[in-house]
Amino acid sequence: MFKKILVANRGEIALRIQRACRELGIKAVMVYSEADRDAKYVKLAEEAVCIGPAASSLSYLNMPAIISAAEVTDAEAIHPGYGFLSENADFAERVEKSGFQFIGPTPESIRIMGDKVSAKQAMIRAGVPCVPGSEGELPDDPVQIRRIAKTVGYPVIIKAAGGGGGRGMRVVHTEAALINAVAMTKAEAGAAFGNPAVYMEKFLQNPRHIEIQILADKYKNAVYLGERDCSMQRRHQKVIEEAPAPGIPRKLIERIGERCVAAVKKIGYRGAGTFEFLYENGEFYFIEMNTRVQVEHPVTELVTGVDIVRTQIMVAAGEKLPFTQRQIQMTGHAIECRVNAEDPYKFVPSPGRITMWHAPGGPGVRVDSHIYTNYFVPPNYDSMIGKIIVHGDTREQALARMQTALLETVVEGINTNIPLHRELMVDAKFMTGGTNIHYLEEWLSHRAR
């Protein structure tokens, strides 16, 4: 096992990794930007290193600064968390070439799965169902592009091969708009991701977003930890997640989970990963794989009892998975609300000083957050300041616990989206379960009328 790990991230996930290290008796070195000098995990750290100014490009995305911090503190491994450099194959490669262990998959796996075209091809080879679309990257010839769209059937969606997080995509309803949409997406993809390649998929009208969590070690052992329903989204950004997914037959989940495990073994994947699917009319369609820990990992932890971050560290240290598929049992229901420092309905970021913070408590309530009273939320990063997660024996009990937890939560001094969550937890359709990925945006536009 490692003696010292450097945590190359910030916010609640930095604190989450720090906690996992403590439990394993590992020293955690925290890195921070000048804007995060007063972060809770920095104050709690045995060792902390400032890696640059507030701007992410000069700190959390600054590879030489992070690797230097690992060198001066004698760390053995680097945990990238999520976001920032977590899915950057070049960073993983530089970490390993510098003599450190990257807590995540190999650079090759990140490269394959990070490019949406090669990921889709790898999944087709492994027998994982994919959204109908172009075989690979779209050609330059407009005639061929039109032919592919005709075969797939309108509406189609044009996606950037190097995209992610809901960026770099365009829905096309008619042939007249097709070529222009492809050209614009290519130009955007080149500017945003350094890769102008785009591909085409059938645009599903009312899908749900269902994802399968996997864990694998380097000895070709792999398990899936059930599913999560992340359909409550706004602009492709998840707002509420839950596990298990309401109303999907277990047999279907088992079948798709087993295919994900087979795919992981086929590509020699190690660590934690998530297969994201669109689910419509009883069918699963692969869209992408995330080669890192996800924001919403706690809902899976609560229903399976598996500590995903701890297991990530253990398999990176060369240990075997400490459980088999048969030992993974899902119990009860978990729901997570992402708490963002923003206007609850206009979504304008709301950085500033928190004058009062009171976290909820009680049976089955977990709060993952790095904030505290008098903490200053910097304007430089993502607006998420924490997550409230609940577990109950049934979905109804989990909903009741979340309603209570949200009523107990106090955040003063800044705006948060807690009022939005309070409304959604008593929304009739959400309470029934099984809403699609467009539901929240439709709900918001209806509310604004």
Regions found by a protein language model. Name each.
Residues M1-A126, L138-R147, Q397:
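ATP-binding N-terminal substructure of ATP-dependent carboxylate-amine bond-forming enzymes
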Residues V7-E23, A48, E71-T73, E96, ...:
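ATP-dependent carboxylate activation and anion-phosphoryl transfer catalytic cores
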Residues I148-I157:
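Acidic/histidine-enriched active-site and ligand-binding environments that engage anionic O-linkages
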Residues G133-S134:
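Conserved beta3 strand of the protein kinase N-lobe
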